[in-house]
Amino acid sequence: MLQSNRLTIYAIGKIKKHWIRDGINQYKKRMPELIINESKTFNLDNLRSNNNIIICLSEEGKQFNSVELCSLLLNFKNKKINFLIGDTDGVSSDIKEKSDLVLSLSPLTFPHELARLILIEQIYRAISISNNSPYHRS
């Protein structure tokens, strides 16, 4: 079973659009253990400690459907999973190279703030799939 207490989202910058913040807060109420860390930079050395998994979001990344994403996250067993979301310029090629996985949410391009909301919804969906809850309909 996938649990939100093993998942952290690291994002560059703060959410400025209130409607995106409201959407994120709705999912945070459902997953209060999920950590969202807003900062100015990523410290990969700290994120890499204890053999944590680093998943970087980028439009050039690998795409999964929701069930595949759930399976991927479940395969990481008891490891802590850190998602990295860049700012308007994305993330550097150095961070992409050092990540365990570069993930794309869609072939479409999204503003970085909206990508956070979409990622959080997909995390909630993956947890729901792993718990056999009715949220996800195949």
UniProtKB/Swiss-Prot annotation:
Native organism taxonomy: Bacteria, Bacillati, Cyanobacteriota, Cyanophyceae, Synechococcales
Disulfide bonds listed in the record: none
Broad class of enzyme this protein falls into: transferase
Reactions that this protein is recorded to catalyse: pseudouridine(1915) in 23S rRNA + S-adenosyl-L-methionine = N(3)-methylpseudouridine(1915) in 23S rRNA + S-adenosyl-L-homocysteine + H(+)
Quaternary assembly: Homodimer.
Catalytic activity, EC: 2.1.1.177
Functional note: Specifically methylates the pseudouridine at position 1915 (m3Psi1915) in 23S rRNA.
UniProt-recorded name of the protein: Ribosomal RNA large subunit methyltransferase H
